[in-house]
Amino acid sequence: MAQQEIPAASFGVVGGSGTVSSDFPARLPDEDIEILADNLIFDTPYGKSPAFRLFAVGEVRALSCRMHGWRSGVTRADASRQVFWVFREAHVVRVLSESGVGTANHLLDPRDFLIPDDYLDLSNRKDVMLDGRYLLIMRDALCPELRASLLAATKKHFSGRIFDRGIYACTDGRHFESPAEVAMLKGCADIIGQSICPEVYLAREIGACYAGLYYVVNYGEGIRPKWSYGTMKDIFYDDAPMIGEVLAETIRETAAKERHCECLALRKETLLKDVYNEASDKG
């Protein structure tokens, strides 16, 4: 049954494949984490939302959903709209996302972390917006301040290789990329995934900071002779609690900081006022 009132939260967490097996954040050992409400489903202009969890890290409230809101019978574009419409109504100002990714850069290996500073949108999910009233300038689309917090939290909980910049190439999926597609991306991108777009656009549209933590789970086809499905499976199940710890630590350490980034300032009123001259019925 859909809820009518959307609770306020300052953080949004878009869970991905890195935490899908861990029931984030319910099983984390942190004493300051409290589940406040569960299985919250809201009516949105784009259909019923995915189930959200409301939780607190200390005094900071966050809303999270699993697997980017993707589910059967709902397009990925609408799933993203539903998630970010709820975030907007909840007054979320910082959004964290995570997922497993493949490699385009031959220097990366499974179990490397990358916190990208830019992206390439190769998906077909174009024109995914909430109401179109803003001109979205995508400079520093991945918030430098939130990325720095993610980096510090990852270093605290992970002793492996962490890269604090790189380019994420977004494809449609759900299949993985062919060797020719990966070859095309070599030299243009470092990692390949399916979720950063349209999330990064929608975060800017609602005026929120956005950053992502991406865990390498496989080599892109042709980067190495073969990659192991068994390794990917082990990563999904064995490393999920650690990824959850990183996200919780990032919320804990970022919450007290004021925003000094440009994320909100880079959302401008549209110049096409004859087209978008008032809020839409989905705004």
Regions found by a protein language model. Name each.
Residues 145, 149-160, 245-253:
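Generic non-transmembrane alpha-helical segments
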Residues 87-91, 186, 204:
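Non-catalytic positions within long, well-ordered alpha-helices that form the structural scaffold/packing
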Residues 221-272:
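His/Asp/Glu-rich mid-to-C-terminal helical/loop segments that flank catalytic regions of hydrolases
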